[in-house]
Amino acid sequence: MSSSGVTGSEQLNRLSCKRCKERKVRCNRVMPQCGRCKPNDLECVYPVRVKRRSARPLIDPALSADGSNAALSTILDRLQRLEAQTVAGSSSTNGQSIPTPSGDGSEVSSSPVAFSTTGHESSALTPHSSDRAMDAMTVLKDAVDQVQELRKRSFGSTAITSSIDIPTDLAKTWVANYFQHMPACMFLGLLDRRIIDLIPDIINLPHIHVDPVILVIYYSIMYHGCSLKASNVTSTSSLGYMNSSYLGCLRAVPSWEREASGTMTDLIAALFTSRVAAEFFDYDLAWRMFKQACEYCQTLNLHKLDSDENNTFFSEAKCDNERRGFWEVIQIDLFYRLILNTPPVITNDIWKVNLPWLDPDSDPLPQGMQTIAFLASSRVSLVIARFFAMLDDPENTTKPEIVAKTEDLCREMQQIFTEWQLMEWLEGAQDNEQDIWVVADVILTGYTSIIYMFRKMALLNSTSPRPPTTDLDIPDSPIVEDAARRLIAALNRLLVIYPYGVTMTALFGAYRCFVAFAYLANTILRAEDPRSYMADIKALERLSDQSTLLCRGNRDVMPLVKAMQSINEEIRKKLEKQTPRG
């Protein structure tokens, strides 16, 4: 219905007035009086839209809107206890210095750009302007769509029939490097490593049958193992072997799914496949595999590790690894829900799992960056859980109120990185691949989550129960700008430590880092004087140039690389216009 004729003092309501609705006549929905009530001098009453209360438990009932204060405080207290143990033990740790929380978090960050969000009001949140020649977000989103399409073609029916030729000696090296240099995968410790060590020697032998679930895990390990710096292969060779490993994984998945019964091995295979698929930009497969993993968690009663029901097959004193694995599954569930707009899975049902290392019979708290990264990532996940609980709370009805609470949560997440000095640690990291990857995961997950939490703000005015969401909807905010800036800095640092094209594509796939690149580029393109963003311009150019160099020969990701180049060219053109010639 046309809204022409509506005066400046009138506004369009989304509901029909009660009188028109009772008489079953069309209402033009103009407030404060509709077109039918006004000429008859009748009282015009509009119904008040009540925010729908979710019928499902949001997370564990402990994290629901009604009980969030006490329960979250309890969990945070437990995290602080673990952090205190970590700080107490870190003083005796040798080697590279391990960061410790700064207490009040007041220490000034020494990263390239300090936090610039203090003192900004919620009114600073503004939508993107659409009156510019180039929208970097649109350009990069289209490029990512092209990458997804090219990769689907690459692994289509033709590729499925091609052979997988991985030399046995290299396969053994990559398996060994994976277990030595990659962070401990969720629940992988429950699988007998000797099985994986034997696979390279027997996989091509006649009359030898390897279970499909073991093949899925084996090829996933090969995928990660051949990309490690310790494997000492060139970027081009690594790309070919990674593609072969992914192909082997895809081939084994259908047979495995037909045989899967919900064992721990099935759970490990599903989590591995979900991770690898996300790095290959196949988010549909990643999401499907993760849903299966959550089903297996429930089949194994991992969501009841600390409930009163003693029907799990884990001993009470020995399930810290399972607790940690389950918490990592929760973190993935929240992250997928945020960036892929998926419904909650494992967090949709009741679960009761304590943090690891709190039981009196537990082993001593491990020291080092692995533990610190887990504690930091757990706090990040709690912030995201509180964010979703806040969105579903019917008491939060106004957009300014929700925006203000979201900004507070994002600043709290920033404080986590400041306290643990994770960016500073990454800047000084050298060759410890295990620690580097777990710290990078926390940094990339946390700052990406900040950006996507603000993306949700653009949907608050929508009346659709499932509004369409895109990466183009991220409003302007100094908090988001800071998060994007730090993400670009982390990417540049990681590509220095691991100068491989597969590193770049895996990070852009798993963490959708193109959103940070596009947001920062749009900020520069909209600025009146881009010269005030010279440090950011150089950081974007550095990332684009390094990606171009590393991805030579990788046809699938060229649309993404060329899109970054074109955006930087546009920034340079604007910069030249603003620079006086003398």
Task: For every predicted segment, state its role.
Residues 186-191, 229-234, 301-304, 337-349, ...:
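Proline-centered turn/helix-capping motifs that create local helix->coil transitions or kinks
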Residues 152-265, 271-282, 309-317, 361-368, ...:
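C-terminal transcriptional activation/regulatory domains of eukaryotic transcription factors
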Residues 100, 104-113, 374, 467-468, ...:
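C-terminal, low-complexity intrinsically disordered regions in eukaryotic proteins
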Residues 1-186, 200-222, 236-237:
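Intrinsic, low-complexity transcriptional activation domains
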Residues 7, 240-268, 292-308, 328, ...:
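Long, amphipathic alpha-helical regulatory blocks in the mid-to-C-terminal portion
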Residues 32-35, 51, 196, 267, ...:
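Short amphipathic alpha-helical segments embedded in low-complexity Lys/Glu-rich regions
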Residues 368, 375-391:
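Extended catalytic-interface subdomain
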Residues 84, 134, 177-180, 275-353, ...:
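Acidic/serine-rich, low-complexity amphipathic helices located in mid- to C-terminal regulatory regions
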